[in-house]
Swiss-Prot record:
Protein name according to UniProt: Phosphocarrier protein HPr
Job description of the protein: General (non sugar-specific) component of the phosphoenolpyruvate-dependent sugar phosphotransferase system (sugar PTS). This major carbohydrate active-transport system catalyzes the phosphorylation of incoming sugar substrates concomitantly with their translocation across the cell membrane. The phosphoryl group from phosphoenolpyruvate (PEP) is transferred to the phosphoryl carrier protein HPr by enzyme I. Phospho-HPr then transfers it to the PTS EIIA domain. Is involved in fructose transport.
Compartments where located: Cytoplasm
UniProt KW Transcription keyword: no
Gene responsible for this protein: ptsH1
Modified residues annotated as Phosphoserine in this record: 47
């Protein structure tokens, strides 16, 4: 299962949004990978170091790929984090 999402938080996937993203990814029975939409490389969404290491900024598109029993629920929750302004998180 795969989705492409535009990152809305002003700081991109850094600090607080990344922390919430990783925490949420770890709650599901799913293997979730994340990468820039225009690149093939993916990193584990459950790794803070990997997620922040991508350096994804505001208004950039990312690709989420998930497998497992909770794949769709995980993608829904992670998409919600990425498409919500940080002030509302």
């Amino acid at each position: 299962m795969e989705r492409t999402v535009t990152v809305v938080p002003e700081d991109g996937l850094h600090a607080r949004p990344a922390s919430k993203f990783v925490e949420t990814a770890n709650k599901f029975d799913a293997d979730v990978q994340l990468g820039r939409a225009d690149e093939d490389d993916l990193v584990p969404a459950a790794s803070m170091l990997a997620v922040t290491g991508l350096g994804v900024g505001h208004d950039e598109s990312v690709r989420l790929v998930a497998e497992g029993d909770d794949a769709e629920a995980a993608l829904d929750a992670l998409e919600d984090i990425l498409s919500t302004p940080e002030a509302k998180q």
